[in-house]
């Protein structure tokens, strides 16, 4: 009897031991239009409007920073539960961790947002839904 219980316990625990069933999906963000390899790419995913659209002003955004290695890059966010999200990217050319803007708030460094809306970013035009794995494309814009 003990052997049957031990075998059952092992078989039942096998998916967890192998890492199967990790909650949430993977968001793959394909970024294009990066004008040079100076600095780094800051990519973030917002689950709510708090701090949107600036990664650094949000306490709830998931942020990744990567060294730029070409005109296009791919960033992955894992373990995202189903729901509404907005993704944002910034080309931090001087690597200071801040988005440079002019005196009226227009970015001096490259920026991009999910759904690639023109003009001032709005949550409604940038939001997308995830129900598992998803891939989006963001084009970096420089003004």
PLM regions: where:
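Short proline/glycine- and polar residue-rich coil/turn motifs
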Residues: 65-71, 129-130
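Short, flexible loop/turn segments at beta-strand junctions in immunoglobulin-like
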Residues: 77-80
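Short solvent-exposed loop/turn micro-motifs enriched in small/polar/acidic residues
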Residues: 59, 70, 119-122
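Primarily secretory-pathway and cell-envelope proteins
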Residues: 2, 7, 19-49, 98-143
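A short tyrosine-centered beta-strand micro-motif
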Residues: 83-89
